Amino acid sequence: LSIRRQRQMCIRDSLDMPADSAPLLDLPLPDPAATEALGRALAPLLRVGDVIALYGDLGAGKTALARAVIRALPGPEGAAEEEVPSPTFTLVQTYERDPAPVWHVDLYRIEDPSELRELGLSEAFAEGITLLEWPDRLGDELPADALSVVLTFDAAGKARRVRLQGGGDWPRRLAGLRP
């Protein structure tokens, strides 16, 4: 199997939540506008130290959701229209926002766990808001209080769904979320 196919199979297996943990939210995302609306609704709930773990196959909408969150957070003039590219090749993109800098991280291309130390993720986890694509690459290093956002396709590969799962105060924070 190709490395890409192996990763897809691995991430697909990790998308299943434990049987004893129901998602806090399970919503349809019928179109890109719904994904953007979810990002705009999630942004005001974020604070320093939050880690949003974005799970999903290639093309599931992880970067689109991260882009919507980043653009929705208060920042310098023009932040709402700022270009927010996928960090697939740069691995990390940072954005000055309120209440904290946002680290948009894509770990898809990480082959060796030793590469993770060079990214400065401990700083991001402590002092910023981290939007993390392909978080399975972190293994045990993913903070326990991260919010897991699982983006999936239906059997036909057309309609999307999102499931949000998190401990700590995430149930309270997400209680009023209405995308």
Residue spans for each PLM region:
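P-loop (Walker A) phosphate-binding loop of NTP-binding proteins
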Residues: 57
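Short phosphate-coordinating micro-motif centered on Lys-Gly-acidic
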Residues: 15-20, 25, 111-117, 121-179
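Post-Walker A helix-loop "phosphate-sensing" segment adjacent to the P-loop in P-loop NTPases
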Residues: 71-83
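Conserved lysine of the Walker
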Residues: 62
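N-terminal pre-Walker A segment at the start of P-loop NTPase domains
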Residues: 18-39
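Single conserved hydrophobic/aromatic residue that forms the stacking wall/gate
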Residues: 1-13
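AAA+/P-loop NTPase substrate/partner-engagement loops
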Residues: 84-103
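Hydrophobic anchor at the beta1->P-loop junction of P-loop NTPases
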Residues: 52-54
